[in-house]
């Protein structure tokens, strides 16, 4: 699988680790956010281990679906986040969950399809 476009849904601790791991790789990484959070991330970027990163922030559905969607939200946010990100999964998109617990993969499989999931944690 060639990763040309990656979207990250949830830029907390796990999402930030994924973002940092993708820096310097030959792919375009976008952070999915909306409203005030999107505005703040666009304006301020993020700091990871003392290094500042500017971010490519996109509202869900504003750009074509990525090849990889990384889901890194809190469990209680998952259903709403998937509603927001429904347009982020095209026919060739695979989804990798960085979420803890057992139920998140069940929710993702039901909403997106088990055949499109990469099990990670």
Feature names for model-found ranges:
Residues 51-53, 58-121:
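Rossmann-like NAD(P)(H) cofactor-binding subdomain of soluble oxidoreductases
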Residues 1-49:
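NAD(P)+-binding Rossmann beta1-loop-alpha1 motif at the extreme N-terminus of oxidoreductases
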